[in-house]
């Protein structure tokens, strides 16, 4: 085990997460159809500030992320500062780590607090799969640049005449990895086959996720962390995630056809997370600053770790690489955790990671460790459901998971929680949080 790495300031202050909030998550082209991610981000941050009761001028830094970026607002963080009543002098910058984006935002704010650069910051992320940057072909893009430099009408017409009809077709955002050309679902299929994960196991995990999420909503467990969002022109509202299947039936999952390997596959739309819109944010401070302001933190950030692996095989095993590092840096073992929350990009990816957590062979051959970190107690795992049920606005998921885990730890009287996620590009993230 590596030496523990405490997350404290030079004065010994811990990193406090004072509050967290998100919009309800909505499936693509439903409740938030036509609403860009920047507006979803403003909505979540504005309500977070209002609920906390803190003077917006006290926020010294905002770090926010967006995976599917819009060209007209490339720095979503700064737009949120300018649109939510914060001081114009509040520092703001944007980050992107694919599905682990808000994990990165939280880590960056934590590091700024530890360095003494700031004492109060906000971290989070927002994404919209309903408002997308529809592009143009490379041929048309090049022609438009050349046309802009052409001096005469005849020169411009000559440039346009070289284009073919297909060059005029709009180009949607890529769904495949830039480096490999593989879709996430292709990797999930590979992992299912390589690790012997059956269709039945995947469907069972998806069914479990929806059942637990539906139960959480029915019992009112999420109301303190999910706001009501009013949708322009403000005649309608959304108060709950609209992807959760309250009538989930295991038998219904078997009816769906594979979505990626249509002949021999097992990954379906039902055992994968859907395209989703939403935003989430957390308010962070040094422990002493929270006390000065009379604020009671939800909990504290104990450790974090990021990992990077090969993209050609098992690309979504990031949690299995990042989690051991986060545990080491927290000075704890897997058995010390009260809760474990893993991002469910796909049921196949989730189950593969659970297998690797318990695999001595994986630990020895891939991690250089003598033994596995251990088998996950499913009574601790994704106890309120996961991303398959809630949905996955890419940049918002990490902040959702952190906030949700802290609230559940508080309900259980405290303890330690792991939140971990895979991400495109072979990346992984893991964070340990603590509630007293």
UniProtKB/Swiss-Prot annotation:
Active-site feature positions: 99, 392, 422
Enzyme Commission no: 2.3.1.16
Keywords: Acyltransferase, Cytoplasm, Fatty acid metabolism, Lipid degradation, Lipid metabolism, Transferase
Signal peptide: none
Keyword Lipid metabolism appears in the UniProt entry: yes
Coiled coil regions in record: none
A single GO BP: fatty acid beta-oxidation
Group of enzyme by EC: transferase
Predominant subcellular localization, coarse grouping: cytoplasm
GO CC, one annotated term: cytosol
Pathway(s) served: Lipid metabolism; fatty acid beta-oxidation
Pfam family for this entry, one: Thiolase_N
GO molecular function, one term: acetyl-CoA C-acyltransferase activity
Localization per Swiss-Prot or TrEMBL: Cytoplasm
Catalytic activity: an acyl-CoA + acetyl-CoA = a 3-oxoacyl-CoA + CoA
InterPro entries: Ac-CoA_C-AcTrfase_FadI, Thiolase, Thiolase-like, Thiolase_acyl_enz_int_AS, Thiolase_AS, Thiolase_C, Thiolase_CS, Thiolase_N
Stored HAMAP family: FadI (MF_01618)
Protein family according to the UniProt entry: Belongs to the thiolase-like superfamily. Thiolase family.
Task of the protein: Catalyzes the final step of fatty acid oxidation in which acetyl-CoA is released and the CoA ester of a fatty acid two carbons shorter is formed.
Subunit structure and binding partners: Heterotetramer of two alpha chains (FadJ) and two beta chains (FadI).
Descriptive protein name: 3-ketoacyl-CoA thiolase
Species of provenance: Serratia proteamaculans (strain 568)
